């Protein structure tokens, strides 16, 4: 199963593409692949992991339906804005309140909130996630926050 849609990831006007696929076969062997490509086809961000770790019950007869729902949800909601980031808090307070950890400096975090830009968020396991932005100067994606329970 594979889906793609146009998104802006590098900046608010970039013409990029978000591609999400789950390989065929039983859940315990299927691979989840998330890729964001530029309009020229360059990989801006990629994530590859066993799909099994992203679902609660992988030993269910309706796994195909669950996989479709997973892909549909991520393809429609995966790219958001750094404007949605909560205000900066000290690490312990942030983790307590948001079940997450800020992975960039306070200065960078507050700049991302003050000047919103596209941000890709996706699960990293059943109850975990990460959010990344593209740093055009560095030419790579940067993890802003990670979280999970």
Question: In which residue ranges do the predicted regions lie?
Answer:
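Exposed acidic/polar residues on beta-strands and adjacent loops within beta-sheet cores, strongest
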Residues: 1-149
């Amino acid at each position: 199963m594979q889906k793609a849609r146009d998104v802006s990831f590098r900046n608010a006007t970039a013409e990029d593409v978000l591609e999400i696929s789950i390989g065929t076969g039983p859940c315990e062997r299927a691979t989840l692949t998330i890729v964001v490509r530029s309009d020229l086809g360059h990989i801006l961000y990629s994530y590859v992991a066993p799909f099994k770790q992203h679902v609660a019950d992988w030993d269910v007869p309706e796994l195909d339906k669950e996989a479709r729902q997973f892909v549909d949800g991520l393809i429609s909601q995966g790219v958001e804005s750094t404007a949605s980031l909560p205000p900066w808090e000290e690490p312990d307070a942030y983790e307590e309140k948001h079940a997450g950890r800020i992975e960039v400096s306070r200065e960078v975090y507050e700049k991302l909130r003050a000047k919103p830009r596209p941000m890709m968020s996706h699960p990293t396991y059943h109850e975990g996630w990460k959010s990344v932005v593209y740093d055009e100067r560095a030419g790579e994606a940067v993890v802003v926050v990670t979280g999970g329970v």
